[in-house]
UniProtKB/Swiss-Prot annotation:
HAMAP family: Tautomerase_PptA. This is Tautomerase PptA. It comes from Escherichia coli (strain K12). The gene is pptA. It is an enzyme of class 5 (isomerase). The lineage of its organism: Bacteria, Pseudomonadati, Pseudomonadota, Gammaproteobacteria, Enterobacterales. Its EC number is 5.3.2.-. It is found in: Cytoplasm. Homodimer.
Length: 77
């Protein structure tokens, strides 16, 4: 708490880049939510482009009103 779940198209990130990403995100969460470092968890899931529709349908579209940053694209047919 909080838990951040990042889903993105595949990227070539080495362990150092992943650690830097996690550190930057952690800093933002600490600053804005007044969380402790030890309470933050972050997942990075790389999703193939052809599978993104399932993410949209299950996680993005149903939560559109709750998103604090909405996507600048739509996958509605």
């Amino acid at each position: 708490m909080p838990h951040i779940d990042i889903k993105c198209f595949p990227r070539e990130l080495d362990e150092q880049q992943k650690a830097a990403l996690a550190a930057d995100i952690t800093d933002v969460i600490i600053r804005h939510l007044n969380s402790k470092d030890s309470s933050i968890s972050i997942a990075l899931q790389q999703i193939q482009p052809e599978s993104w529709q399932a993410i949209w349908d299950a996680e993005i579209a149903p939560q559109m009103e709750a998103l604090i940053k909405k996507p600048g694209y739509s996958m509605n047919a």
